[in-house]
Amino acid sequence: MLNFFRRLLGDSNEKEIRRLQPIVEEINRLGPEFARLSDAELRAKTDEFRQRLADGETLDDILPEAFATVREAAARTIGLRHYDVQLIGGIVLHQGKIAEMKTGEGKTLVATLPLYLNALEGKGVHLVTVNDYLAKVGAGWMGPIYHFLGLSVGFIAHDQSALYDPDYIDPNANPEDQRLVHWRPCTRREAYLADITYGTNNEFGFDYLRDNMAYDKSQLVQRELHYAIVDEVDNILIDEARTPLIISGPAQKSSDLYRQMAKLVRQLRRSSVTAKQVKEEGLEPDGDFFVDERTKSIYLSEKGIEKLEKLLNIPPGESLFDPEHYEKTHYVENALKAQFIYQRDRDYMVTPNGEVVIIDEFTGRAMPGRRWSDGLHQAIEAKEGVPIKNENVTLATITFQNYFRMYKKLAGMTGTAYTEREEFAKIYNLDVVVIPTHKPMIRKDLPDQIYATEEAKFRAVLREVQEMHEIGRPVLIGTTSVETSERLSAMLKQAGIPHNVLNAKHHEREAAIVAQAGRKGAVTVATNMAGRGTDILLGGNPDGLVEEFLRKEGLTLETATPEQKRAAWEKAKALTEAEGEEVRQLGGLHVIGTERHEARRIDNQLRGRAGRQGDPGSSRFFLSLEDELLRRFGPVERIKGLMERFVDSDVPLQAGLLDRTIESAQTRVEGYNFDIRKHTVEFDDVMNKQRQIIYADRKAILDEADMRERVLDLMAEEIQRQIDEHLSDGVDEFGLTELLRVYRRIDPTLPATVTAETLKGKTKEEIEQFLLDHLETTYAEREKAIGPEVMRTVERRVMLGAIDRQWVDYLTAMDELRQNILLQAYAQKDPLVEFKRESFRMFDELKANIAHDIVYNIIPASFQYEAYLRQIAEEQARRLATAQIAGGSSEVEQTRKPQRRTVQQIGRNDPCPCGSGKKFKHCHLGREHELAAFMNNAPATTPKVEPQPVKPAIAEEAAKIKAAIDNGTLPAASPKTPRGRQPQAVPRGKKR
């Protein structure tokens, strides 16, 4: 029925391709005309297009001519000409959609079309890849096209930024690879100011966060996010979607508890009754805990809780879940997960120097620098007995989902996106268009072979490898873990089959291994090939053989002459071409999958390694009923029982029913993971709106030259609030005393002669106006004393410091809220609704805290502005240093308790830490409790700085102010509009 309607209505993807065909025909029609242009005339097209855009034409209007220009420039510079299907891919990318293009179809070349077109607007465009190498190679390879057409190209990596310059030769680059030699080092800002910038998703995201930690406009590097093409878009926007980018700093927590819990959980016994049986059949666990493998969660049984309470020495009558013991449950849960769910060489590896490194479950890559959050990484370090690193506190964070949704126009390309089209549409508003291949796909995807046990499956894999190896066909074996790849490697070694292993432990040889995986008789064992970014060429890659041929002649790349290198390359090229033709005759690359992945997309990526650009090839998956996917989601027990009774262990089962079961299991897991990611977005959207408000405020402070009026408004609002609080029942001595005490924390210059007694006869309105006038006078005096320019700097630094300190604490509080809010589901409340309600309340509190921080610090900071600015500079340097090394970090968010600064031992003649400029004995001596309260409202993370000598001019000014304070003769406020509550008849532009 579905096929009937598809034939009746036509496939929507085919309709989309047909709709674009007239544009392709127009580009082809322009081809001969553009081919007749001289180089100068072709280059001049760029200026012509820019002028036409300025005159009112749109990008769509000039698209055919722009694409024809790039096509001709590519042919002249790098010898490649875009196929028609590549033109279709370029149009799809320009339209802000995802182009699904199979392996080997030339995505790197396709991207030049929309990048050039959109760069003509002069707002900067980004090409996002999954690693630094691919970004640098891609930009360097396509660089001659852009340079020929007068566009600049930048490249950013974690520790490097550069501009493409054909006249520059990098002395440290391999001179044989022209893609890498013409990168001239530049500043980060210059790389972003280029017309086109290539880089990784991590670096673009981290630069955004770093920009929003800057204390000066000169530190900003990014422009407004205009247009981006995301390569391997499914990997970045789906696989990495739940992994936030986090810049963090150290938080102090004891590692002893992790070690204690790691030893303790080894005494607990796992229940043989599964989570599924507990939930569906109502069976009681027969151990201390049981595991839900589907959600990777661990649940303690009643028996387990009692056992833990004894092991933790919790007194009788008290519970592990009482508030005073509740923190320990977090350590217990992490220790259990580390011991019983996370496996070495599957989920992580331990390096020779004792570091726990996460293994990417989708690509099999080691991810140094990334750490699991919430103490899980520390729990695994305790389990493995390696040094435990400190937990961290989040300084800035954003998910890829929210970062990439900030671009005005977003597009993507990958070999596998169609199965995830619903998620791309719902979360990113991106349509997926499958681009036809240039040559027909002739790869044979053979039926799965399913065995009862894992042992039988691996024996079958070995037999198939031997069979292919004997006839000379190259074989690629894909595994889902380092452990499996090592196991297969041992079996192949025992069988005498030479092979290469590519996994997280051997990543440094990755490019060389993949480049030669298509040679005759080659056998390559690799963890998931997703994101490798290197094509497997039948017959091998000649570039990778040059060094080998030179070595046989006693030469190296450094000692060989250019003629010797050219001769070696010609020899390698002849060999690989001959081998390639022979391998094609044998049937091409054979891909073996040893386990189905949770996502069909990853399986398709593995299959896609064979049959590139019309080459022959084949693929087959070998499965067992003990595989994780079938064990977690399939009707394993019933089928396994039948197979053990009626089928020999080495005889595979090939049944359509089980194929449907596997696909159904994958679909369910994909749906489950989609729901989780959608859930993540719904929660993070709340935080994202708040982040945008805070970051916009930071940017406004950096951009605005004068924040004086805003600061005075905040101070006026605080004074009004304090008057309402302390004089709510009328003007009395107690209320006035408290009001003046608080006011002096804002403005320490209020004369001692101003007391509750002297103000007792005034009305609330008169008192308010008196304090506001005094405040403006003090502010004007401080500005005159240190100079307007310095005062503006103090304002910016105080305001940015207040935002950053409060934001860090807010991120921690929001993380705690997000973890705890899920308990609302048990109270029959919608966790998302409760999260929104509580987060809005907390955000209002955050804004109030920021204002409070600014108001109570600005005048004291102006008295000791040199020391204060030095403190801020040191704090900023630490934060920026943390941000700069954040290129490889990931989820490291940790909870912490608010840090409070305590008053140090102060000498009688030392300057008072409140910032008044007076000696301690004349200021807060005898009122240390007030000083402590004041200090705890000062910057919590500001480092202690020794008192600095005051410049003579400042000392003289301070002496005048001190004399005025002592004599009660501060100058009257200058006549200006009162900064207080105004009569209702007088309209105000903004509330003070």
UniProtKB/Swiss-Prot annotation:
Major site of localization recorded for this protein: membrane
Annotated EC: 7.4.2.8
Database matches in SUPFAM superfamilies: Helical scaffold and wing domains of SecA, P-loop containing nucleoside triphosphate hydrolases, Pre-protein crosslinking domain of SecA
Broadest EC class assigned to this enzyme: translocase
HAMAP family found in the cross-reference section: SecA
Similarity comment: family membership: Belongs to the SecA family.
Identification of the protein by name: Protein translocase subunit SecA
Lineage of the organism: Bacteria, Bacillati, Chloroflexota, Chloroflexia, Chloroflexales
